[in-house]
């Protein structure tokens, strides 16, 4: 019986060992990828206002913003995730939805972007077949950092300026109980169209708070101004993720961290350690059973009282 149990343990140990090694070597490259089931809304709030064409003055008041992000699953593949992102900036008046119609007086600005990113590095890839012809070619990071983010400078795409800028690592900071890496993006006097056919300049100082394990953006602040070429200020804006949005992002990131740790750490540890223990235990059982087995010749030559049979 011990031999049978031992052999079963050896077989089980071999299975666990292989499973643990596969999880350790193969799993990180599979699970540390941007998912293709993204369908999220990010909420920001702050103060802002745009110039009143009749008076030439800016009335600053409470504003809200939303970013609606979805993955186009049909256009995406194993290596690339294709995103459709719609952003709306609105006056915080009444019951404001995620976005309002173009003729709604509460609307301050709206835009829709299509882009494709590498599911491993999170960097934007060439548009190619992933987005419609004529779509602006972006570069750099956009809606997340890579898994296992580093304390270094990354290129970060700014859709308003139409250019990638350096996102420079600044510090570590706690957000809602989660350690984040803070990166700063500074844009000065970037030439833009303040309105259709109206040239001007754009300034922005962004700070992005990143979960270094998953690369998720936990919080973001943005201080932004836009000016006409005449020097008249056209937009004044200060935005940050809402407190609820930050809590949601932290909870989601922690859930993803636990899933990653299970697959990349605990399954390999349990598989490899458990497999080795089972193999060693199985071998010991087989060897012990072999040592306990009596010698047939010796048994035949000895009487029950312990005396040897006579030799002829």
Name every feature range the model reports, one short phrase each:
Residues 2-148, 257-261, 284-292:
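Extracellular or lumenal secretory-pathway regions
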Residues 2-8, 258-312:
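Juxtamembrane interface at the cytosolic side of transmembrane helices
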Residues 26-31, 190, 196, 228-233:
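A generic "cationic amphipathic patch" detector
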Residues 59, 168, 184, 221, ...:
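Ser/Thr- (and often Asn-) enriched beta-sheet segments in non-cytosolic proteins
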Residues 70-76, 222-236, 265-275:
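A broadly tuned preference for mixed-charge, low-complexity surface segments
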Residues 112-114, 121-125, 134-139, 149-152, ...:
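Charged, low-complexity helical/coil segments in non-catalytic cytosolic or luminal regions
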Residues 130-219, 226-227:
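Membrane-proximal low-complexity regions enriched in glycine and acidic/polar residues
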Residues 210-256:
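Extended, hydrophilic extramembrane loops/domains of integral membrane proteins
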């Amino acid at each position: 019986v011990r031999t049978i149990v031992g052999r079963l343990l050896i077989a089980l140990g071999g299975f666990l060992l292989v499973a643990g090694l596969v999880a350790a070597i193969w799993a990180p490259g599979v699970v540390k990828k941007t998912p293709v089931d993204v369908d999220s809304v990010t909420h920001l709030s702050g103060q802002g206002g745009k110039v009143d064409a009749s008076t030439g003055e800016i009335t600053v008041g409470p504003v809200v913003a939303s970013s609606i992000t979805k993955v186009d699953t049909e256009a995406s593949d194993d290596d690339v995730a294709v995103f459709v992102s719609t952003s709306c900036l609105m006056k915080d008046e009444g019951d404001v939805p995620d976005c309002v119609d173009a003729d709604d007086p509460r609307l301050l600005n709206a835009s829709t972007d299509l882009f494709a990113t590498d599911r491993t590095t999170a960097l934007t890839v060439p548009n190619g077949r992933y987005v419609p012809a004529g779509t602006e070619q972006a570069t750099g990071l956009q809606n997340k950092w890579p898994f296992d983010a580093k304390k270094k400078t990354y290129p970060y795409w700014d859709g308003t300026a139409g250019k990638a800028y350096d996102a420079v690592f600044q510090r570590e900071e706690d957000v809602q109980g989660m350690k984040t890496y803070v990166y700063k993006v500074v844009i000065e006097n970037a030439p833009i169209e303040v309105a259709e056919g109206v040239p001007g300049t754009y300034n922005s100082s962004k700070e992005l708070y990143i979960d270094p394990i998953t690369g998720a953006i936990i919080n973001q602040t943005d201080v932004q101004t836009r000016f006409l070429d005449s020097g008249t200020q056209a937009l004044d804006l200060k935005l940050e993720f809402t407190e609820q949005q930050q809590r949601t992002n932290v909870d989601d990131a922690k859930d993803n961290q636990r899933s990653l740790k299970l697959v990349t750490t605990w399954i390999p540890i349990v598989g490899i350690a458990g497999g080795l223990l089972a193999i060693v235990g199985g071998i010991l059982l087989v060897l012990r059973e072999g040592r306990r087995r009596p010698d047939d010749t010796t048994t035949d030559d000895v009487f029950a009282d312990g005396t040897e049979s006579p030799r002829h």
